[in-house]
């Protein structure tokens, strides 16, 4: 058996870079036990902003002095770069099985947010209310749960590991979904919808970290694309099934079907999902070696040596600090939150718009959401087709082959044109009762633009905040969920006041104004990231 000294070896540079990059999304704080206050907002102009680049993770590299580790025989690390216990070295079937199951869970949670939308008129009738605010809030309150969940679940995953968060969250999700099906009044339904979102936020909050734990840099793009489809495609697909189900069996059966589906997925998760969090795995290894060797001084390479309460509180505060003090994080989060809110704005009103203006039945109106979903799929295809090519071309042309976060921006220029165009088409063609395929084309174009912007902004945040990418993404996710929850609350009232044409035009004008953000970030983003005034102490 290898001694504890063997676990202090510095891995080869290439593998170490990959590990540092792979643990960035949700484990950035775990490499800084001797440097708890680090400037993270900026990387200088010469640094490659891609995860895994040594200059990009300079703070983490400094905190983990390899020479110091070699001098300390009590540091427990992986058994070299090929250690089979390292999730990045798992067999392909095990690795991609985890990715597949996690992606399915991540798809199901947003699916549940909107699958209920076509049944809202039935709920209002059953509970004897005609309050339009309650109609949209029943959908929105779930998103508020998704906004609150990451603030608690992400820090807990750093203390207890990722897989336990998934399993416990899945079981609680089933319980609260059943409670929704059994609700006897509107307040009860709203409360349990919120709890469903709260406990279901785990895959969205920490799923990116699991993907990063499992995959190498070469594999990560494909895995992240598959996983990221869930939060974007799920809300668009849900109402398709929900429409026919509510028409045939009633709105309560939507929740029964969700509970049954979640039960099957939970069983699959228990059978397939395994812990990938490096801090948790190395801590387990440390405890085992302490028992085997009797050396109580052994400690994990990733052990922060701080109280769990301190780590928990620090992790909760970090996203808020980035959102408030970093202009890059704030601007991108607001931009992505606004366009993401358009999904739920449309979802919460499609039923009323197409039933009132085109006479669609509950079952048929669910098919309307397919247009938005197709737009999302086309957006992923376009992003994958042009994103990496543009980034490589700009890096070769402008920076001697070294990528920068700003090179993620160009695809958003296309998206910034698609969103207002789609909103104008959708709003005015519905206003004048143009054949239903035309407004759906507008919804498709808007969905395509929404998808491209969300993927591009997430990639920018990961590249720019490499060490604390998880916190930057958490900040963006929370703001995005808040926008997604609140926009539907005034959707119907805005349509009643302005009409469908001018109501959607107002949103389109805001999107046009925000179109200035991408070029400004492309030309001035690096300057903002490196400016001393905007360095954030975390």
UniProtKB/Swiss-Prot annotation:
Tell me the GO molecular function terms: transmembrane transporter activity
* Major site of localization recorded for this protein: membrane
Q: Specify the protein's topology with respect to the membrane.
A: Multi-pass membrane protein
What are the record's GO terms for cellular component?
Answer: plasma membrane
Q: Which UniProt keywords apply?
A: Cell membrane, Membrane, Transmembrane, Transmembrane helix, Transport
Gene3D superfamilies per the record?
MFS general substrate transporter like domains
Its annotated compartments are: Cell membrane
Q: Which CDD domains match?
A: MFS_Tpo1_MDR_like
Which top-level group of life is the source organism from? Eukaryota
The family note in this entry says: Belongs to the major facilitator superfamily.
Function per UniProt: Efflux pump that might be required for efficient secretion of radicicol or other secondary metabolies produced by the radicicol gene cluster.
Q: Mind telling me what this protein is named?
A: Efflux pump radE
What is the gene name? radE
């Amino acid at each position: 058996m290898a001694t504890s000294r063997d676990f202090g070896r510095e891995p080869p540079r290439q593998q170490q870079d990959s590990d540092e990059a792979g643990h960035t999304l949700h484990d950035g704080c775990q490499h800084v036990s001797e440097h708890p206050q680090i400037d993270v907002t900026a990387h200088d102009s010469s640094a490659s902003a891609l995860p895994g680049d040594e200059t990009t993770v300079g703070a983490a590299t400094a905190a983990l002095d390899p020479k110091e580790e070699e001098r300390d025989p009590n540091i427990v690390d992986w058994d070299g770069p090929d250690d089979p216990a390292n999730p990045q070295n798992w067999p392909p079937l095990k690795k991609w099985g985890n990715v597949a199951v996690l992606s399915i869970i991540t798809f199901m949670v947003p699916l549940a947010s909107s699958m209920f939308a076509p049944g809202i008129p039935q709920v209002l009738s059953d509970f004897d209310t005609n309050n339009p605010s309650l109609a949209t809030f029943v959908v929105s309150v779930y998103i508020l749960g998704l906004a609150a969940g990451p603030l608690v679940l992400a820090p807990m995953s750093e203390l207890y590991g990722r897989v336990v968060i998934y399993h416990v969250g899945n079981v609680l999700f089933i319980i609260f979904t059943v409670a929704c099906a059994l609700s006897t009044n509107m307040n009860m339904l709203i409360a349990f919808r919120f709890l469903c979102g709260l406990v279901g936020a785990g895959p969205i909050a920490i799923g990116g970290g699991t993907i990063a734990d499992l995959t190498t840099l070469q594999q990560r793009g494909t895995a992240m694309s598959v996983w990221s489809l869930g939060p974007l495609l799920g809300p668009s697909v849900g109402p398709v099934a929900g429409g026919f189900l509510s028409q045939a069996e009633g709105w309560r059966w939507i929740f029964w079907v969700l509970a049954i589906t979640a039960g099957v997925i939970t069983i699959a998760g228990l059978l397939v999902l395994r812990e990938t969090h490096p801090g948790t795995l190395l801590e387990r290894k440390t405890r085992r070696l302490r028992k085997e060797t009797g050396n109580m001084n052994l400690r994990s390479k990733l052990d922060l040596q701080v109280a769990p309460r301190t780590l928990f509180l620090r992790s909760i505060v970090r996203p808020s600090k980035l959102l408030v003090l970093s202009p890059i994080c704030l601007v991108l989060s607001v931009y992505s939150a606004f366009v993401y809110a358009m999904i739920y704005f449309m979802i919460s009103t499609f039923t009323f718009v197409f039933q009132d203006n085109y006479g669609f039945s509950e079952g048929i109106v669910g098919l309307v959401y397919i247009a938005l979903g197709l737009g999302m799929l086309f957006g992923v295809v376009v992003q994958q087709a042009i994103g990496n090519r543009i980034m490589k071309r700009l890096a070769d042309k402008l920076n001697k082959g070294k990528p920068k976060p700003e090179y993620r921006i160009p695809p958003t220029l296309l998206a910034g044109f698609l969103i207002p165009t789609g909103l104008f088409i959708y709003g005015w063609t519905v206003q004048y009762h143009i054949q239903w395929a035309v407004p759906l084309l507008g919804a498709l174009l808007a969905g395509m633009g929404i998808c491209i912007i969300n993927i591009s902004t997430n990639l920018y945040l990961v590249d720019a905040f490499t060490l604390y990418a998880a916190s930057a993404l958490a900040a963006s996710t929370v703001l995005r969920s808040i926008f997604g929850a609140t926009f539907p609350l005034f959707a119907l009232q805005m349509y009643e006041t302005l009409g469908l044409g001018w109501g959607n035009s107002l949103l389109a004008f805001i999107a046009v104004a925000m179109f200035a953000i991408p070029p400004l970030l492309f030309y001035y983003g690096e300057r903002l990231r490196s400016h001393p005034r905007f360095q954030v102490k975390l």
